[in-house]
Amino acid sequence: MIIYPAIDLKDGQCVRLVQGRVENKTVYSDAPANVARSFQEQGASFLHIVDLDGAFQGSPQNLKAIEAIAAAIDISFQVGGGLRQLSDVEKLLALGASRVIIGTRAVSHPDFIANLLDKFGPERIVLGLDAKEGMVAVEGWVSTSSVSAIDFGLQMKALGIQTAIYTDVSRDGLLQGPNLAAIKEMASSTGLDIIASGGVSSLDNIRALKELENDGVSGAIIGKALYDGKIGLVDALREAESKF
């Protein structure tokens, strides 16, 4: 199982929000590239980067910071947040992103996903599937759609999506542990390769997610728990790679 340390960008800084709310912001670093380099030095193989300003404004806003991160590391990274135009996707892939994450736009314009898959392939286009009480959350989690998260996952799988980052919005940044039942149901019901996000806050959580590997859970994104010292990245990586 792959552990993805998270870097959330706002105004060029590395921050964390609680449940996606800007008023619940903690700034962890003015130099996100240094944070990225530190994660690489500790053994991470893949980073998860979110442009929070982009998510709220609908187009990438932290390209300078992302470019600096790309220059600072030799490992893979995926980026999401406000990717609603083909040109923005092309820009991020050109900056060195291994994968881009499409969320809101996939809900309102499934044809956009189909076009991206056709142009770049499923290895480079990942679905950002954010859910609140079983329904798809959109627009930087500000609103909830009337679409069931599982139905949406099935629809995207039918279009050719292979990998989805599944975030339970109600758990994000609260360090309460992931919603294991919902994650397992999403993976087994849709057949998508699921990267779990939201609430991972202990090595026990990582062990529990690792037990869902056979159901289709291939990774976990960890943010706040790393920054607050609840989990050490080296320990998390060791746990994720261990054989039972």
Swiss-Prot record:
Pathway: Amino-acid biosynthesis; L-histidine biosynthesis; L-histidine from 5-phospho-alpha-D-ribose 1-diphosphate: step 4/9. It holds the Pfam family His_biosynth. Keywords: Amino-acid biosynthesis, Cytoplasm, Histidine biosynthesis, Isomerase. The active site is at D8 (proton acceptor), D130 (proton donor). One of its GO terms (cellular component) is cytoplasm. Its main location: cytoplasm. GO terms for molecular function: 1-(5-phosphoribosyl)-5-[(5-phosphoribosylamino)methylideneamino]imidazole-4-carboxamide isomerase activity. The keyword Isomerase applies. Disulfide bonds: none annotated. One of its GO terms (biological process) is L-tryptophan biosynthetic process. It catalyses: 1-(5-phospho-beta-D-ribosyl)-5-[(5-phospho-beta-D-ribosylamino)methylideneamino]imidazole-4-carboxamide = 5-[(5-phospho-1-deoxy-D-ribulos-1-ylimino)methylamino]-1-(5-phospho-beta-D-ribosyl)imidazole-4-carboxamide. The keyword Transferase does not apply. Its EC number is 5.3.1.16. Gene3D superfamilies: Aldolase class I. Belongs to the HisA/HisF family. PANTHER family: 1-(5-PHOSPHORIBOSYL)-5-[(5-PHOSPHORIBOSYLAMINO)METHYLIDENEAMINO] IMIDAZOLE-4-CARBOXAMIDE ISOMERASE. This is 1-(5-phosphoribosyl)-5-[(5-phosphoribosylamino)methylideneamino] imidazole-4-carboxamide isomerase. It comes from Syntrophomonas wolfei subsp. wolfei (strain DSM 2245B / Goettingen).
